[in-house]
């Protein structure tokens, strides 16, 4: 089993700013406020996709941003909503908080959606701030910031394809050509002790390929590391049996084929039910007679026979597309992950907290901090609106309960100001 991991930074779109505007009609030169609202920022949505098998696409980019909302306009026109950003991931992907490693979401189904970062709300235009005592408000709200997160995508890969065959038939070379893996390649027997895994991309599709360590006679009885090797084969969807059809090391490819198949059957008879593609490798070394003999004997007994040369890459592309098409014909099974996960659920916190620290009175909480962010301190009416909301929410009363006096320092988010009633 192999863990595919990707770290990505996410930034949802900022909400558009509300507009400060007034009606200017021909017969109404002193019309009322007409500033429209800003559009909401785009959210970032994670979607499960059964056709994606790996996290390979997230190795090329690390930062993803959704579109911001458009600003409000005159005549009460709303700004354009920012477009949501869709991130497709394989079914079975765990979405984790990067810093705490806690599970935020487990993508279990095809087309399942989860909003990982919500876009900021658009700011209200000045049309919303008209009142009996404020007929021409000259302020509007800025848009909210979008949510930001750094997450880790984690996918447990069970190899889709198992490369099997005796040592030195060219499996490691083939894996390195077909995928992003860089296995150690040496011309001696039994060198690989763990499966080398590679991710292969064919057009828009991808699959995981495992070079199963070289099997030997007696593997089904545990000789060498037989049982350890064979257990990896059980988890694959299809087998690709690689043969040195040239017999370059003095071996008979037909005898080799029968030996490996015998070991598979002895270990687990169900392995005979797996789809098997047979790859006749090293055709560049001259193997016409062996190819003819093999095809005559096995054409009607195996799913496909492909002639290739890993050394010259002849027909390797053909093999990759054949594997991808074969995998498409096999129903996916997502029941392989039976671990229990502890999910992280955010506790609902109060809208704000007020505390005293030395000579400062500190107000904390996303609702109040966002209100500060959306206040234009250059405009008296905007500041006056802020003060009214702080009173309505009970912030002013809690500050008084802590003993605040005129002239004392108040800190909300990144903003500091003196308190005066």
Swiss-Prot record:
<dbReference type="InterPro" id="IPR045086">
    <property type="entry name" value="OBG_GTPase"/>
</dbReference>
<keyword id="KW-0547">Nucleotide-binding</keyword>
<comment type="similarity">
    <text>Belongs to the TRAFAC class OBG-HflX-like GTPase superfamily. OBG GTPase family.</text>
</comment>
<keyword id="KW-0378">Hydrolase</keyword>
<dbReference type="InterPro" id="IPR006169">
    <property type="entry name" value="GTP1_OBG_dom"/>
</dbReference>
<dbReference type="Pfam" id="PF01018">
    <property type="entry name" value="GTP1_OBG"/>
</dbReference>
<dbReference type="InterPro" id="IPR014100">
    <property type="entry name" value="GTP-bd_Obg/CgtA"/>
</dbReference>
<feature type="binding site">
    <location>
        <begin position="281"/>
        <end position="284"/>
    </location>
    <ligand>
        <name>GTP</name>
    </ligand>
</feature>
<dbReference type="GO" id="GO:0005525">
    <property type="term" value="F:GTP binding"/>
</dbReference>
<dbReference type="InterPro" id="IPR005225">
    <property type="entry name" value="Small_GTP-bd"/>
</dbReference>
<feature type="binding site">
    <location>
        <begin position="190"/>
        <end position="194"/>
    </location>
    <ligand>
        <name>GTP</name>
    </ligand>
</feature>
<dbReference type="InterPro" id="IPR027417">
    <property type="entry name" value="P-loop_NTPase"/>
</dbReference>
<dbReference type="GO" id="GO:0005737">
    <property type="term" value="C:cytoplasm"/>
</dbReference>
<feature type="binding site">
    <location>
        <position position="192"/>
    </location>
    <ligand>
        <name>Mg(2+)</name>
    </ligand>
</feature>
<feature type="domain" description="OBG-type G">
    <location>
        <begin position="159"/>
        <end position="328"/>
    </location>
</feature>
<dbReference type="Pfam" id="PF01926">
    <property type="entry name" value="MMR_HSR1"/>
</dbReference>
<feature type="domain" description="Obg">
    <location>
        <begin position="1"/>
        <end position="158"/>
    </location>
</feature>
<dbReference type="InterPro" id="IPR006073">
    <property type="entry name" value="GTP-bd"/>
</dbReference>
<protein>
    <recommendedName>
        <fullName>GTPase Obg</fullName>
        <ecNumber>3.6.5.-</ecNumber>
    </recommendedName>
</protein>
<keyword id="KW-0342">GTP-binding</keyword>
<dbReference type="InterPro" id="IPR015349">
    <property type="entry name" value="OCT_dom"/>
</dbReference>
<keyword id="KW-0479">Metal-binding</keyword>
<dbReference type="InterPro" id="IPR036726">
    <property type="entry name" value="GTP1_OBG_dom_sf"/>
</dbReference>
<feature type="binding site">
    <location>
        <begin position="165"/>
        <end position="172"/>
    </location>
    <ligand>
        <name>GTP</name>
    </ligand>
</feature>
<feature type="domain" description="OCT">
    <location>
        <begin position="344"/>
        <end position="421"/>
    </location>
</feature>
<feature type="region of interest" description="Disordered">
    <location>
        <begin position="21"/>
        <end position="40"/>
    </location>
</feature>
<comment type="subunit">
    <text>Monomer.</text>
</comment>
<dbReference type="GO" id="GO:0000287">
    <property type="term" value="F:magnesium ion binding"/>
</dbReference>
<keyword id="KW-0963">Cytoplasm</keyword>
<dbReference type="InterPro" id="IPR036346">
    <property type="entry name" value="GTP-bd_prot_GTP1/OBG_C_sf"/>
</dbReference>
<dbReference type="GO" id="GO:0003924">
    <property type="term" value="F:GTPase activity"/>
</dbReference>
<keyword id="KW-0460">Magnesium</keyword>
<dbReference type="GO" id="GO:0042254">
    <property type="term" value="P:ribosome biogenesis"/>
</dbReference>
<feature type="binding site">
    <location>
        <begin position="211"/>
        <end position="214"/>
    </location>
    <ligand>
        <name>GTP</name>
    </ligand>
</feature>
<comment type="function">
    <text>An essential GTPase which binds GTP, GDP and possibly (p)ppGpp with moderate affinity, with high nucleotide exchange rates and a fairly low GTP hydrolysis rate. Plays a role in control of the cell cycle, stress response, ribosome biogenesis and in those bacteria that undergo differentiation, in morphogenesis control.</text>
</comment>
<feature type="binding site">
    <location>
        <begin position="309"/>
        <end position="311"/>
    </location>
    <ligand>
        <name>GTP</name>
    </ligand>
</feature>
<dbReference type="Pfam" id="PF09269">
    <property type="entry name" value="DUF1967"/>
</dbReference>
<dbReference type="InterPro" id="IPR031167">
    <property type="entry name" value="G_OBG"/>
</dbReference>
<dbReference type="InterPro" id="IPR006074">
    <property type="entry name" value="GTP1-OBG_CS"/>
</dbReference>
<feature type="binding site">
    <location>
        <position position="172"/>
    </location>
    <ligand>
        <name>Mg(2+)</name>
    </ligand>
</feature>
């Amino acid at each position: 089993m192999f863990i595919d991991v990707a770290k990505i930074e996410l930034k949802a779109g900022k909400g558009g700013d509300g507009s400060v505007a007034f009606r200017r009609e021909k017969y109404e030169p002193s019309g009322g406020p007409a500033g429209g609202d800003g559009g909401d920022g785009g959210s970032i949505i994670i979607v499960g996709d059964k056709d994606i098998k790996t996290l390979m696409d997230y190795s090329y980019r690390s930062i993803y941003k959704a579109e911001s909302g458009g600003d409000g306009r005159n005549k009460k026109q709303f700004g354009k909503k920012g477009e949501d950003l869709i991130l497709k991931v394989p079914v079975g992907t765990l979405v984790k908080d990067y810093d705490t490693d806690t599970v935020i979401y487990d993508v279990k189904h095809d087309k399942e959606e989860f909003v990982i970062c919500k876009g900021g709300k658009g700011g209200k235009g000045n049309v919303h701030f008209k009142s009996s005592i404020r007929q021409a408000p000259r302020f509007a709200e800025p848009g909210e910031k979008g949510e930001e997160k750094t997450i880790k995508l984690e996918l447990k890969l069970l190899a889709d394809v198992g490369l099997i065959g005796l040592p030195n038939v060219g499996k490691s070379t083939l894996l390195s050509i077909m995928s992003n893996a860089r296995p150690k390649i040496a011309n001696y027997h039994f060198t690989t002790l763990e499966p080398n895994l590679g991710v292969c991309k064919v057009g828009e599709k991808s699959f995981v390929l495992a070079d199963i360590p070289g099997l030997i006679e007696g593997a089904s009885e545990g000789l060498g590391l037989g049982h350890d090797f064979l257990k990896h084969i059980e988890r694959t969807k299809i087998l690709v049996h690689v043969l040195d059809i040239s017999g370059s090391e003095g071996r008979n490819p037909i005898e080799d084929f029968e030996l490996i198949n015998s070991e598979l059957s002895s270990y687990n008879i169900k392995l005979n039910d797996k789809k098997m593609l047979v790859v006749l490798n090293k055709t560049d070394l001259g193997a016409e007679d062996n190819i003819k003999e093999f095809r005559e004997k096995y054409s009607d007994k195996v799913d496909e026979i492909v002639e290739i040369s890993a050394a010259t890459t002849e027909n390797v592309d053909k093999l990759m597309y054949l594997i991808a098409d074969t995998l498409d014909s096999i129903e996916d099974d997502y029941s392989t992950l039976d671990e229990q996960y502890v999910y992280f659920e955010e506790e609902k916190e109060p809208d704000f907290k007020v505390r005293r620290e030395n000579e400062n009175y500190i107000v904390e909480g996303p609702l109040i901090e966002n209100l500060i962010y959306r206040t234009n301190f250059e405009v008296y009416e905007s500041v006056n609106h802020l003060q009214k909301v702080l009173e309505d929410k009970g912030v002013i009363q809690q500050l008084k309960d802590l003993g605040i006096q005129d002239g004392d320092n108040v800190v909300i988010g990144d903003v500091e100001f003196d308190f005066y009633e």
